[in-house]
């Protein structure tokens, strides 16, 4: 693409669009690469895979994730953001201006970059996992746990780390029963979280078990479990199935040019979106391995835009 960009945003979730809107209003005319099925997710990010959203401020009536992201995209366009349906596959931060390479082979030069590529939930590739996604299957208890289809029902959670403990605990507030499925005979979660789960009368633990099939008609109705020691299979009637086996940050395209934590999330300065390279910022789930909430990602995008504008003003 011809010309030098002031700011490029990589990613089109709540963090990316919030950053874009703020930079657009600062008259930077930012360029956004929203991605073309990047990480297997449509433009708009992980939120587009969420059904009903009831906890995003400003929407008293329920709205779907896709609808919310469509509104954010429209707002970005109204604020002079140029949106391109391309995926950035490589970057060069070793010299200035920075160079971004697209999957098409085209290159873009820019003075600053905001990385808002998010993180993709790890899922299981088993029969029924695609058919019942958002029809009883979810990867976010905080987002979906209070929905009517899960209230006072039996819900399964798969995982054994801190996230699984937190998700199971949260779901126990709404479900009749939560079944925590783990492939081993002990959790890897912190001891205090384990104790809370084991003392919760609404949570049942299925040790040495793995899900091998999800079944139902229009909605999810059951999960088939296989014992990892005996191979025996049992069927468990459930109305919900929640993945809590972690997330993969979408950072492979960086090629090791930024510092990442042991899970692959971008490391930023405390209380900031600044990376160790001046002019490169990271916002949203790609630099926050803990919360994975749209409103937090959006706030992070706002901070990235403000810090980016401050950086550009100092050049």
Question: Regions from the language model: what does each represent?
Answer:
Residues 25, 125, 131-149, 245-291, ...:
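FAD-site-proximal beta/loop scaffold in flavoenzymes
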Residues 1-10, 25-26, 31-38, 81-153, ...:
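FAD-binding core/adjacent interface of flavoenzyme oxidoreductases
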Residues 18, 41, 123-124, 165-166, ...:
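Glycine/Thr-rich phosphate-binding loops of Rossmann-like dinucleotide-binding domains
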Residues 76-94, 100-102, 107-109, 172-270, ...:
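A Rossmann-like FAD-binding core segment of flavoenzymes
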Residues 1-10, 25-26, 224-228, 234-240, ...:
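Rossmann-like nucleotide/phosphate-binding core characteristic of flavoprotein oxidoreductases
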Residues 13-15, 119-121, 161-163, 288:
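Residue-level detector of alpha-helix initiation sites
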Residues 5-79, 165-191, 261:
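Beta1-alpha1 glycine-rich phosphate/pyrophosphate-binding loop at the start
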Residues 139-143, 156-166:
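Active-site glycine-rich loop that binds ribose-phosphate moieties when present
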């Amino acid at each position: 693409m011809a010309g030098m960009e002031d700011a490029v945003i990589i990613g089109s979730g709540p963090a990316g669009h919030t950053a874009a809107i703020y930079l657009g209003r600062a008259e930077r005319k930012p360029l956004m690469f929203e991605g073309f099925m990047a990480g297997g997710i449509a433009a708009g990010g992980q939120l587009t895979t969420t059904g009903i959203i009831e906890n995003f401020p400003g929407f008293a009536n329920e709205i779907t994730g896709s609808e919310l992201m469509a509104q954010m995209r429209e707002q970005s366009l109204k604020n002079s953001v140029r949106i391109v349906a391309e995926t950035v596959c490589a970057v060069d931060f070793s010299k200035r201006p920075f160079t971004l390479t697209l999957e098409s082979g085209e290159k873009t030069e820019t003075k600053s970059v905001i990385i808002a590529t998010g993180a993709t939930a790890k899922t299981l590739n088993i029969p029924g996992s695609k058919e019942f996604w958002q029809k009883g299957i979810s990867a976010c208890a905080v987002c979906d746990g209070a929905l009517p289809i899960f209230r006072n029902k039996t819900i399964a959670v798969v995982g054994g780390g801190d996230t699984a403990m937190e998700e199971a605990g949260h779901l126990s507030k709404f479900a009749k029963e939560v079944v925590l499925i783990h492939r081993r005979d002990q959790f890897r979660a912190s001891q205090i979280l384990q104790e809370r789960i084991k003392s919760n009368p609404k949570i049942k633990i299925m040790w040495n078990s793995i899900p091998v099939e999800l079944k139902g008609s229009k909605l999810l109705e059951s999960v088939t479990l296989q014992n990892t020691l005996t191979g025996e299979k049992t069927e468990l009637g459930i109305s919900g199935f929640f993945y809590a086996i972690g997330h993969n940050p979408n950072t492979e395209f960086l090629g090791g040019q930024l510092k990442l934590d042991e899970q692959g999330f971008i490391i930023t300065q405390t209380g900031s979106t600044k990376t160790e390279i001046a002019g490169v910022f990271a916002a949203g789930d790609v630099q926050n391995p803990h919360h994975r909430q749209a409103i937090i990602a959006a706030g992070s995008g706002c901070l990235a835009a403000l810090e980016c504008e401050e950086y550009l003003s100092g050049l």
